[in-house]
Curated annotation (Swiss-Prot), chain A:
WD repeats lie at residues 105-144, 147-186, 204-247, 326-374. Keywords: Nucleus, Repeat, Ribosome biogenesis, rRNA processing, WD repeat. It comes from Scheffersomyces stipitis (strain ATCC 58785 / CBS 6054 / NBRC 10063 / NRRL Y-11545). SUPFAM superfamilies: WD40 repeat-like. This is Pre-rRNA-processing protein IPI3. Its main location: nucleus. One of its GO terms (biological process) is rRNA processing. Pfam families: WD40. The lineage of its organism: Eukaryota, Fungi, Dikarya, Ascomycota, Saccharomycotina. Belongs to the WD repeat IPI3/WDR18 family. Component of the RIX1 complex, composed of IPI1, RIX1/IPI2 and IPI3 in a 1:2:2 stoichiometry. The complex interacts (via RIX1) with MDN1 (via its hexameric AAA ATPase ring) and the pre-60S ribosome particles.
From Swiss-Prot, chain B:
Belongs to the IPI1/TEX10 family. The gene is IPI1. Keywords: Nucleus, Ribosome biogenesis, rRNA processing. This is Pre-rRNA-processing protein IPI1. Gene3D superfamilies: Leucine-rich Repeat Variant. One of its GO terms (cellular component) is nucleoplasm. Residues 1-38 are annotated as: Disordered. GO terms for molecular function: chromatin binding. Component of the RIX1 complex, composed of IPI1, RIX1/IPI2 and IPI3 in a 1:2:2 stoichiometry. The complex interacts (via RIX1) with MDN1 (via its hexameric AAA ATPase ring) and the pre-60S ribosome particles. Component of the RIX1 complex required for processing of ITS2 sequences from 35S pre-rRNA.
Amino acid sequence: MDESVFYIAEGDPNDKHSQESFALATSIHNSQQHASFRQADAPKNGAILSGSGQGERLIVAAPNKALLNVYSWGKESPDQRIPLPEALTCLALVEHPNTRLFSEFHRNSEFKLPSYRVPWLLAGGSKSGKIYVWELSSGSLLCVKEAHYQNVTVVKFSKCGTFLVAGSDDARCTVWKTLDLIAVFDGDNDESSRNFKPYLAITDNTLAVTDLVLNEPGVINDLKLYTVSRDNTLRIYDIITKQLLTTFILSEAIESVVADPAGRAVYVGLSNGLIRTIPLYNINPNTSVLESIGGNQKIITVESDPNLKFTFLHHQQRISADANKTSILHKNLNNKKNDTENANKPIHVTKLAISLDGTNLISGDSLGRVYVSDIVTRQVVKTFTPCNSPISQIQVSSAPFEALNVSSNSKVDKKHRLIPQLKRVLTGRDATEHQLNLEIPSESRDESDENFAVWLSRKTQEDLEFKNLSGVNSSVKKVANITSDSESKKELEDKLAKLSSAYTQLRSKHEELLKEHSKVLNNKA
Amino acid sequence: MATKRKKAQKAKDFVKPKLKVGKTAAKPDNHTDTSFTAKTISLPNQSIAKKSKSGVSEEQKQEIDLSHHLSLTKHHASATRKEVLIYIDQHLPSNPSLYKQIFTSIIPLILDQSASVRTTLVALFNKCANMQPGILELHIRSIALFIHSAMTHLHPEIRNSSTKFLNVLVEHAPQSLSKSFFVKTMRSYFTLMSWTLTDDKKSVSLAITTSAAIGGSVKKARIGHLAVLKAFLQASLFPQLSDSAESEINPAIVVSVHPQSYKYLIPAATSQAFAPLKLFANELPNNSKDIDDGKFHISDLDTITAEDLDTRRKVFVDVFQKPVVKNLNSLVKEGGEVGREANSCMTIIDNLEQELKKVAEDE
């Protein structure tokens, strides 16, 4: 297995046709580069990768253009350019809950992954504050919702697909039920089905919401939302109870956030180039009680950190960036004024991501640099090829080695690779017209080395599962009868006698002791 | 007359000058002398004392200084390399993000030819580990790689000092070292001490020839090797009750809902805690046949992950114990300082045996 980091930048505004922009997928653990995508640039959060490996796709919203670029893994140039009703600023994908379970169960065991697979829904936020939702396997536009008053900065689905959360420049954050958003086919009358309210609208912030993350709990009751905003706050919400749990106040505007996979800490990227660790649990030094920090609508001011125990500094360094950037050619092309302007601009940490095991933090900044750093020692472990503009998206995904390296013979021809054109008008309400084509994957079990006994046992298992009406899977094992010859019988009888005598002895001893014990107790009393 | 002279001059132009062997050719008419003499030549890139530029902030200046010194760690003169290490030692930055650069330049010096550089480096490693807890764990992959290379180096002096670096790891990062590199370090020890894992003729004769090349200095160095081996075995074969770092949580006094809860906190000093599991390592498949008798064999050594204490003990008992004990016994017979150290190694192995017996009895 290898872990792949995908990163993309916003693109140089002077570079009209984004000739110099590129996006890369690189391994964290070795020096291998898994994939690269040319002419790729996206507004912040405006690119989404469905996964890493053969058959996965990268979907990129072109900056300031009503256009979506779709790339396939292993191919550098865009496969498709899909026109949209409006320029999008952020994107999110979600797997269908059923197929997600299916693919998780069967990823390595019985079924191959289908060679043509698309996620279930694509959601996008636009500059005018609308949220669009498409079904990817048919391309139909299921929902256009006027959710915000200003530019939507980030949309995210919860891992289970139940909720869609959107953050915006209008300082609000809205949580939607996915089922409400895609309920085009159920409603009889237009009004009720189109004018649904958000599940939760958060209006606590005073400035733009820049980023948000949801944790990935096993049960939905633990679903938590972490939002960060330019008003220096990190807020933690419980979505099911609609409660604000904790507010952390920092010293600078917050640009990005990521949460530890086990919920032990939150990492925030600030607008002065620092990354702060905010622990959610600590051991109280006075009472040595392990306690959680915050909760119960507490407001906590995060203190400055002179010992640098909770701070990552490496984005503040400018020298290494200049060494990368200021080649002689570059200096000649740009006039000096531009350079000094750049040097005085503060460095923002624009995106953060965390590795699978929660030991490495991946961070990108407004100079286009991407670092992997160790969380315990706060050291840079790896430096990636820098981009020429602010980093707009970082995603981490893991896949087996074989899947990441695209072999030439397994390439699918273009016709079978493309996703359907996304519709620009809302789909009709006639559910009978809603047709989907899905590939049913073949079984990956090797039939050759299967003998009759294995087949038989599998069939009995299947039979049991079919007949079984309760939730418990149990099978009765028959133990072969012992031929009752006298010898073994006698042996067993002897054993029994021995055991029973030992038991009675023990029993009497125990009673004796108990008596003694009660006597002692009585005496004391 | 005039015409005659002209003719003579013209003819002179076409006469080929005669060159004589052993004499330098005459300079041509248009020759310009460009030679010069100088009392000193200064190469500012290679000097330790560097003039700092004006107009940069104090912090940046320090950083430039440091990167200049780091480039000098590859200087051809061993004295300069040593001076540079001392300079870095005295100017270690408080900013943790600079340590990656420092480590990438100083780790290769484990294999440096000069003994004084290597001893300075040991001190530098110690200081780094004290200033930034967890730093050795973070870079343990490359440090261990170079140490193993040093332990099996052709140059006897580099081999002799290799265990000093190993000792730094045993002191500051015993957990990570034993979890990730127990088997490799043990194997390197066999090469270092010119012991053999198997008794077949070929390897024995090879070991004898290499041990024949061992001179007086190598014999002396064995004392140090054995002392470190003892510490290494102690660290990797016995449970570590208290961690060295004071920032580590003391489980005895923590009050929590579940007594093991503190184990799930983000560790304070162990970086890359999951690295020994080799989740993301792409290793070559093992082609040798499995002999399934519940024991480890020499052929298995390349694929074993000795992440937990029980596996390490089992590997040690199954593969290493017999040859180690045999060789230690012969060292004990030699007597002297070496014998004493070998003896103390033996007590560690005896302790292990007793503990294993106790475990077996309990079951």
